């Protein structure tokens, strides 16, 4: 909730952790009290998380470029993977720590201290807070690698927090944490329709969300820790993951600022024409005659004609396919996890003979179907597409990694972080080399400049531990 943009990490953490009394001393205004409740903090953290994951503002988020769904028209630094000019890694780090994790932590402390809440209300609210916290921690790990974790939210004790090992400390702990709260959704009473903007207080839906997040955690580990991966995935499925698009973890944005989808701000309100569809995704979809093209892209070049801009080059806004009309709508929903994503995870699990209650073909088809339906395709579109020899799971070329990876990546359009992560995990589809820099797709964000300058010793140790603070350093789970 608190938009205190201080470029130095340690200071931003200090100010984010200040008590309400301290805020009163700084900002005392009897007509505008600064005391905030746990539900307001939870709602604010929720929106901050969705906004950061949805935005395509290159000052904050370049994941849609990293996934090569979009490419740029005039200013092409970011599509050539230069993130230093705008301190993008610092912005993402600060947003996720300060405006998401600290607000969630503050909300947690207020729930615990609120004597008016019943034990069931505390249990449910704390479970909701925990799920969004775990989601955010995983996102940070999957962006940077090792990060400050055990010391990160204890600023009075640790002004310069140490980094934790993502493989041996953070991921196992996140799995333990989500295991500890899943059962609480059965009896707990969460934030209701006012505070909970995702499910409006539906705890059954939250339990599916938690299990689907647990599934994601487990699938990330399949190549590096197959034993933990199997047990995590199978227990998540047994407890109940998403089974339709009705389960999707969405934030329905509103038509008026400041509650519109950030995409609308970037693409419409700004009046700018910074992005077109990248040739990477357009070429693949054209080859497959993909029915999602009229939803993903505009037909501004011509009827049923789709042209992608060369990735990493300066591209014409008028002669390349523009981003689809849905992405220009102020109310277009943001997504944290959806049924299509869950289905592709289950397809991989089935290929690995995990006990998940279906075949790889069934889950693969479910993932494609869910994506086409979500974007507005018809039943005939789905039937014809699945029958295409290059889409049909039995006949499509390549290994299961290529089949699942390519269709999974296509389904994550507009969810740049997951699209980038799918490519890192499965190594498909084949990405383009950026035209101007001739650099390949980065494998991680480098650590923020402020960490390098201010938290030097801990940054040095973390950099050495992961194999170097470089865009080409693989994350611990990316071993293929």
How should each PLM-predicted stretch be described?
Residues 372, 376-480:
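C-terminal functional modules
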Residues 35-39, 73-379, 394-401, 407:
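Structured, solvent-exposed acidic/aromatic patches
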């Amino acid at each position: 909730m608190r938009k205190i943009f201080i470029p130095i990490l340690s200071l931003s953490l200090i100010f984010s952790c200040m008590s309400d009394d301290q805020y009163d001393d700084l900002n005392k205004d009897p007509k505008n009290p600064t005391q905030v409740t746990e539900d307001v903090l939870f709602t604010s953290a929720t929106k901050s998380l969705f906004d950061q994951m949805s935005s395509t503002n290159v000052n904050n988020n370049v994941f849609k470029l990293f996934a090569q769904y979009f490419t740029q028209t005039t200013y092409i630094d970011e599509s050539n993977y230069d993130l230093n000019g705008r301190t993008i890694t610092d912005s993402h780090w600060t947003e996720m720590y300060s405006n998401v994790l600290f607000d969630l932590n503050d909300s947690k402390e207020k729930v615990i201290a609120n004597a008016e809440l019943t034990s069931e209300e505390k249990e449910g609210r704390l479970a909701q807070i925990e799920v969004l916290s775990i989601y955010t921690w995983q996102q940070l790990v999957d962006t940077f690698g090792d990060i400050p974790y055990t010391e990160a939210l204890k600023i009075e004790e640790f002004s310069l927090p140490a980094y934790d090992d993502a493989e041996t400390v953070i991921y196992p702990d996140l799995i333990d944490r989500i295991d500890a709260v899943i059962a609480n959704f059965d009896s707990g009473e969460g934030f209701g329709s006012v505070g909970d903007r995702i499910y409006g207080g539906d705890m059954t839906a939250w339990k599916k969300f938690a299990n689907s997040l647990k599934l994601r955690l487990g699938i990330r580990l399949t190549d590096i820790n197959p034993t933990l991966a199997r047990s995590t995935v199978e227990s998540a499925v047994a407890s109940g993951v998403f089974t339709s698009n009705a389960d999707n973890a969405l934030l329905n944005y509103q038509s008026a600022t400041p509650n519109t989808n950030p995409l609308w701000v970037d693409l419409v309100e700004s009046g700018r024409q910074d992005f077109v569809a990248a040739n990477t995704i357009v070429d693949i979809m054209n080859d497959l005659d993909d029915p999602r093209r009229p939803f993903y892209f505009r037909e501004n070049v011509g009827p049923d004609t789709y042209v992608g801009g060369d990735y990493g080059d300066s591209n014409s806004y008028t002669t390349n396919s523009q981003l689809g009309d849905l992405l220009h709508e102020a109310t277009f929903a943001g997504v944290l996890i959806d049924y299509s994503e869950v289905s592709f995870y289950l397809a991989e699990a089935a290929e690995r003979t995990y006990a998940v209650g279906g075949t790889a073909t069934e889950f693969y088809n479910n993932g494609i179907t869910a994506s086409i339906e979500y974007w507005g395709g018809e039943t005939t579109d789905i039937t014809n597409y699945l029958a295409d020899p290059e889409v049909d799971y039995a006949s499509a070329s390549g290994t299961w990694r290529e089949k699942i990876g390519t269709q999974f990546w296509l389904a994550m359009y507009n969810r740049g972080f997951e699209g980038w992560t799918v490519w890192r995990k499965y190594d498909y589809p084949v990405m383009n080399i950026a035209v101007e820099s001739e650099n390949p797709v980065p494998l991680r964000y480098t650590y923020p400049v402020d960490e390098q300058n201010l938290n030097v010793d801990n940054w040095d140790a973390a950099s050495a531990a992961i194999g170097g603070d470089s865009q080409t350093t693989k994350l611990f789970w990316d071993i293929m």
